[in-house]
């Protein structure tokens, strides 16, 4: 199980979760409860085995009870949509988001090649390795001040303008498979949270369609979403640039343009979720102020719903911070959302 092998590849962890559900296909009524879905599939849930990387407590019980109400209550499988933020919810986002590391390395290369960029942000921060500047920009953004975000965004858009979608995917995929987290000492693909990976498998085993709804780049996450999370690439919702198509002898080429299509954060999250799924999710999980509209949108008068807010409070195993989540934590208390404490609710982190 994921909780017993922190060094085990996450793809194997997710597969182990799914096998644990299949292993429950037996007849002992005390160990297992059979749930019939309104489809040709039947799933069995062994309550003693599920969410093994979660400690027994209010958060784990809330998840299991929500799934039980959804399935036993006959909510059609096609309505079982769950959405998850990525940075800080599914994988580690400190000391900086993983995609930020990817982009800063490219900006550093650009500043090396063109000295004129070294005095301009964000190339200046990348060249001087002033990652504190980036942290300040992100903190300002979550506090509602996007003045410096526009400066950062201009650099982000310039970093990969003009390259094909295939080339961008190859670069991001290679980065994620080779780069390591600066303080945790593990590869970035091993920075996904084992309890959340297990939760994704648990939901899928009970007929849910899981989606990523992230402020991070859609095309940055797509190459690894299936392998790491078991989420197909067509279920990845995220920020995006605009594209340009050019006809050629090789079937045509789509390239990134140096302009944003949309930033999938704040109010854009529910808009993009609706645009992609045509539904209000039954479950949403986030960790920051930018996730509040998505969590608000996951509300139903006549169906079960669950809002999860991941709280980073474990300096020993991960990080301890609330910056950028102050409003979300306040709303969680006011609205009865389920707070998931990394320190108290997770038996394992990675």
Task: Say what each PLM segment does.
Residues 47-54, 58-64, 68, 158, ...:
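C-terminal cap/substrate-recognition subdomain and adjoining C-terminal extension
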Residues 41-86, 101, 107-120:
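Non-catalytic pre-domain segments flanking phosphatase-related domains
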Residues 95-189, 194:
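A metal-dependent, Asp-based hydrolase signature
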Residues 80-94, 295:
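Asp-based phosphoryl-transfer active-site loop
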């Amino acid at each position: 199980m994921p909780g017993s092998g922190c060094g085990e590849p996450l793809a194997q962890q997710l597969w182990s979760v799914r096998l644990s559900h299949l292993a429950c296909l037996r007849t002992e009524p005390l160990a297992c409860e059979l749930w019939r879905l309104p489809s040709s599939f039947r799933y069995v849930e062994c309550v003693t085995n599920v969410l093994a990387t979660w400690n027994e407590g209010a958060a784990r019980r809330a998840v299991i009870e929500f799934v039980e109400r959804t399935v036993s209550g006959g909510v059609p499988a096609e309505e079982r949509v769950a959405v998850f933020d990525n940075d800080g919810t599914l994988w580690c986002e400190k000391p900086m988001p993983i995609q930020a590391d990817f982009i800063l390395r490219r900006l550093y290369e650009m500043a090396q090649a063109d000295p004129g960029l070294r005095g301009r942000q964000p190339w200046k921060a990348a060249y001087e390795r002033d990652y504190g500047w980036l942290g300040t920009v992100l903190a300002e953004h979550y506090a509602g001040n996007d003045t410096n975000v526009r400066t950062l965004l201009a650099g982000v858009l310039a970093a990969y303008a003009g390259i094909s979608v295939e080339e961008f995917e190859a670069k991001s995929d290679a980065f994620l498979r080779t780069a390591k987290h600066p303080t945790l000492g593990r590869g970035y693909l091993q920075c996904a949270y084992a309890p959340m990976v297990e939760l994704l498998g648990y939901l899928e085993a009970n007929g849910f369609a899981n989606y990523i709804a992230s402020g991070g780049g859609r095309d940055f996450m797509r190459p690894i979403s299936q392998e790491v999370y078991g989420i197909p690439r067509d279920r990845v919702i995220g920020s995006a640039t605009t594209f340009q198509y050019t006809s050629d002898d090789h079937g045509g080429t789509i390239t990134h343009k140096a302009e944003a299509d949309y930033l999938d954060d704040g109010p854009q999250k529910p808009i993009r979720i609706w645009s992609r799924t045509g539904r209000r999710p039954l479950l949403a999980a986030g960790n920051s102020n930018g996730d509040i509209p998505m969590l608000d949108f996951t509300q139903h008068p006549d169906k079960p719903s669950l809002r999860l807010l991941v709280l980073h409070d474990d300096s020993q195993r991960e990080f301890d911070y609330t910056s950028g989540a102050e409003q979300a934590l306040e709303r969680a208390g006011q609205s009865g959302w389920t707070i998931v404490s990394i320190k108290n609710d997770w038996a394992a982190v990675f």
